[in-house]
Amino acid sequence: MTEAPTELPPEDGTPPREPGDEWVIEILRDIKEEALKHFDPRLLTALGGHIYARHGDTLERARELIRVLQRALFTHFRAGCNHSRIGQTRGGNPLSAIPTPRRM
């Protein structure tokens, strides 16, 4: 068997990133974008500052922000956010427009 090629460090001399780093950063951008639609930006800035004070500018900080924002958004949607169907009784099933097979 041949060994997997080793990753070369970037040309600017910084240490190489792990493969999942880009994914974590991309997910954080998406969640922050969604959180800004539902929460006060000052609150999100304060949250980011608090997590930065605990974890510094690390990948662990990004993961912690993702965890906290996911929980906050889930709770917000369950409480009946007007931008979401989760927790709301009005509005029909979005899948009801799809016809079911006759023999079901």
Swiss-Prot record:
UniProt main location, coarse: virion
Keywords, comma-separated and alphabetical: Activator, AIDS, Cell cycle, Host G2/M cell cycle arrest by virus, Host nucleus, Host-virus interaction, Modulation of host cell cycle by virus, Phosphoprotein, Transcription, Transcription regulation, Viral penetration into host nucleus, Virion, Virus entry into host cell
Subcellular location: Virion; Host nucleus
Modified residues (Phosphoserine): S84
Gene Ontology CC: one annotated term: host cell
Superkingdom: Viruses
Region (Disordered): 1-20, 83-104
InterPro entries: RetroV_VpR/X
Subunit text: Interacts with human UNG.
Protein name according to UniProt: Protein Vpr
